[in-house]
């Protein structure tokens, strides 16, 4: 525990407070003076009146009370908390016994009118009881009788009831104690010693046996059996078993008595009332007699362990029941005859009615000649599914034969056979060769070489096919006015320039290329001057360079995916 060091001034102040407190408690009168009854308003709001008196200068409480109050508040705020309190603080010493409890205890006492013999017997019992209680109290710790304290695990003392006990000397000394073996009677008990002897000259009355102080040594069963006083009753032999053959019983009655055939229901077991054994009060000596006499085992008296018997083989219930039924000599009795009905219950109409004798049926001989019938062809029960359906006759198809023929032909030849025959037309290009040049004529055609003709036609066809495969030309952009004027000037210059080479010097291939290019230009609606590079393949170097420069200058800025000029679209002014 930590010690709290206090200021010496505080200790001095608290000592003064304690002195004032002791004076105050010493001067308390035994009966408090009846003070003025406060009004309900004053009792509830006493703090407000006290503040008002303090403001006016009137001090209601004395200096001692104020000092005590301030010291108490200081102690509660700064001092360590107490873990326990004294009995005086809890007001446990001031509790007085209640008068109603005494009245209830007095009411519990019962009064009886008894004879003189019963009274003397009661006094003897009380004397023996007080002696036993005094011996028991010596061992127990002594408790000082003082003011009532809260019980700490000890039960409260019970209020004792005074009840007279009637004793009959003619009855046996001990009450029969219920035991497992009803036939065996317990041995006689020893007599008790008398603690208090009451002698009367007139008559001698028997005294009850007292409880011995020392525990008696239990005797061995062999020595006890030798005594002539203790008579051991002979064991009753069980009745001899009766043979089953002597008892005439039917098969049904044997089944009813059998344990296997008896139906055990849950309700029947629950409804059987259980016999409750009333436990009577057993005395100390009786409990000693009931205990088994166990002596410390010695080497001589120690019994030899018996060898365990082999477990009996369990026979199933069904087999044992069947064997017992086969071994039993049961005679089946005939069905008992029904008793006759009494005359009062008989019906007069039924008795008068006579039963008619049964007439045997007549045997009639029928001489009927049956005609001969044709043998019937029995159809099989299981009909075939194919015969039951009537399928129409169809024409035989040559599909399989054609398939076999097609499989023999190779795949390449199949494709050629499936192609449609086209009419061979002469190409239009050699027919228009005469229109290529106005002044000059081709020398190769005059000679009439057929081989050169065929070669030229094949080349022209290949050129035409290549042109078809080319991607479509992008649309031209819209040309502005200054560009258009510039193009017109260039076109005029190109027309005025003289042709350097004659058309005679051009080859047939160049002429064919020129014709195909002119057709493409007409189809696309383009200017003829733009494709001047293709037409003049065999021209001089000066002419080709001049044409390239003109094409580069006149080439418009065309985007392949757009049809308008570059830049955003111009919007008309909305606010004019």
From Swiss-Prot:
Compartments reported by the entry: Cytoplasm, Cytoskeleton, Actin patch; Cytoplasm, Cytoskeleton; Cell membrane
Record PTM Phosphoserine, positions in chain: 46, 79, 88, 185, 220, 309, 320
Skewed-composition ranges (Basic and acidic residues): 191-206, 544-556
Stretches with biased composition (Basic residues): 561-576
Keyword set includes Phosphoprotein: yes
Superkingdom of origin organism: Eukaryota
GO cellular component: actin cortical patch; cellular bud neck; cellular bud tip; mating projection tip; membrane; mitotic actomyosin contractile ring; plasma membrane
Ranges annotated as biased composition (Pro residues): 304-313
Polar residues: compositionally biased ranges: 243-255, 264-279
Record's keyword annotation contains Coiled coil: no
Transmembrane residue ranges: none
Membrane topology per record: Peripheral membrane protein
A GO MF label: actin filament binding
Keywords: Actin-binding, Cell membrane, Cytoplasm, Cytoskeleton, Membrane, Phosphoprotein
An annotated GO BP: protein localization to mitotic actomyosin contractile ring
Region (Disordered) location: 24-50, 132-160, 173-316, 541-576
Primary localization class, coarse: cytoplasm
PTM entry text: Phosphorylated by CDC28.
Interaction with F-actin as annotated region, ranges: 408-470
Residue ranges the record marks as coiled coil: none
Interaction with the F-actin capping complex: annotated segments: 547-576
Stated role: Recruits the capping protein complex to actin patches and the actomyosin contractile ring, and/or stabilizes their interaction. May serve as an adapter to link INP52 and INP53 to the cortical actin cytoskeleton. Binds F-actin.
Additional free-text comment from the UniProt record: Present with 704 molecules/cell in log phase SD medium.
Subunit structure of this chain's protein: Interacts (via C-terminus) with the CAP1-CAP2 F-actin capping protein complex. Interacts with INP52 (via SAC domain); the interaction is direct. Interacts with INP53 (via SAC domain); the interaction is direct. Interacts with RVS167. Interacts with SLA1.
Stated name of the protein: F-actin capping regulator BSP1
């Amino acid at each position: 525990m930590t010690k709290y060091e206090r200021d010496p001034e505080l200790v001095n102040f608290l000592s003064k407070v304690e002195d004032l407190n002791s004076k105050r408690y010493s001067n308390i009168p035994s009966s408090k003076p009846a003070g003025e009854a406060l009004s309900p308003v004053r009792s509830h709001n006493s703090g407000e009146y006290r503040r008002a008196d303090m403001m006016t200068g009137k001090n209601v409480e004395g200096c001692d009370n104020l000092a005590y109050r301030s010291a108490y508040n200081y102690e509660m705020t700064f001092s360590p908390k107490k873990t326990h309190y004294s009995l005086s603080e809890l007001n446990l010493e001031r509790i007085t016994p209640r008068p109603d409890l005494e009245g209830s205890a007095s009411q519990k006492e019962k009064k009886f009118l008894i004879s003189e013999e019963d009274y003397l017997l009661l006094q003897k019992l009380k004397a023996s009881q007080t002696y036993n209680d005094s011996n028991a109290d010596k061992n127990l710790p002594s408790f000082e009788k003082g003011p009532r304290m809260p019980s700490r695990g000890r039960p409260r003392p019970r209020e004792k009831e005074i009840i007279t006990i009637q004793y009959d000397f003619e009855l046996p000394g001990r009450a029969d104690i219920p035991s497992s073996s009803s036939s065996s009677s317990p041995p006689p008990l020893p007599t008790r010693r008398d603690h208090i002897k009451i002698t009367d000259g007139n008559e001698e009355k028997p005294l009850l046996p007292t409880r011995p102080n020392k525990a008696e040594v239990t005797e061995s069963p062999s020595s006890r059996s030798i005594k002539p006083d203790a008579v051991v009753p002979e064991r009753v032999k069980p009745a001899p078993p009766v043979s089953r053959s002597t008892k005439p019983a039917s098969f049904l009655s044997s089944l009813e008595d059998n344990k296997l055939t008896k139906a055990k229901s849950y309700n029947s077991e629950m409804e059987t009332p259980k016999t409750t054994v009333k436990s009577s009060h057993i005395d100390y000596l009786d409990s000693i007699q009931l205990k088994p006499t166990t002596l410390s085992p010695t080497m001589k008296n120690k019994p030899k362990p018996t060898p365990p018997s082999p477990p009996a083989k369990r026979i199933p219930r069904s087999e044992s029941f069947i064997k017992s039924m086969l071994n039993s000599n049961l005679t089946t009795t005939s069905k008992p005859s029904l008793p006759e009905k009494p005359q009062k219950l008989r019906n007069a109409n039924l008795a008068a009615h006579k039963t008619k004798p049964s007439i045997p049926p007549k045997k009639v001989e029928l001489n009927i000649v049956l005609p001969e019938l044709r043998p019937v062809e029995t159809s099989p029960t299981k009909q075939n599914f194919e015969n039951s359906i009537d399928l129409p006759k169809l024409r035989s198809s040559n599909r399989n034969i054609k398939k076999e023929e097609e499989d023999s032909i190779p795949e390449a030849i199949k494709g050629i056979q499936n192609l449609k025959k086209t009419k061979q037309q002469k190409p239009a290009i050699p027919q228009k060769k005469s229109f290529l040049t106005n002044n000059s004529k081709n020398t190769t055609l005059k000679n009439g070489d057929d081989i050169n003709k065929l070669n030229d036609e094949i080349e022209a066809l290949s050129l035409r096919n290549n042109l078809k495969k080319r991607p479509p030309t992008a649309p031209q952009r819209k040309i502005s006015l200054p560009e258009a004027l510039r193009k017109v000037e260039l076109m005029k210059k190109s027309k005025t320039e003289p042709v350097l080479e004659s058309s005679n010097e051009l080859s047939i291939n160049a002429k064919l290329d020129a014709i195909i290019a002119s057709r493409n230009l007409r189809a696309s609606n383009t200017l003829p001057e733009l494709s001047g590079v293709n037409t003049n393949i065999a021209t001089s170097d000066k002419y080709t360079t001049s044409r390239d420069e003109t094409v580069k200058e006149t080439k418009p800025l065309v985007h392949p995916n757009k049809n308008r000029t570059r830049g955003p679209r111009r919007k008309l002014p909305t606010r004019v």
